Amino acid sequence: MQKDVEYIELLDEQGEQIKFKVITYFQIDEINGEYVVVTPAENDECDEAFVLKVISDEDGNETLVSIEDEKEFDLVEEAYNLVMSEQD
């Protein structure tokens, strides 16, 4: 995934494209994971953010998926808070 992308479009459950603003992109070396934090682009006042994991297949194609594992999510949340505190 390009690290300098400002917006991405994702498909919802109904197959419709929704535009998201990329808040930040980061890696966690300890668990060999890449993550992106996004928020809906249409609603600038939305406090809701989504953390997605970047998964690459054997051909190098990337897919964004939600994080199901609670321990992984806790590590990602901690890393995100650190990244955001460094940006302040």
From Swiss-Prot:
It comes from the Bacteria. Belongs to the UPF0473 family. This is UPF0473 protein CLL_A1177. The lineage of its organism: Bacteria, Bacillati, Bacillota, Clostridia, Eubacteriales.
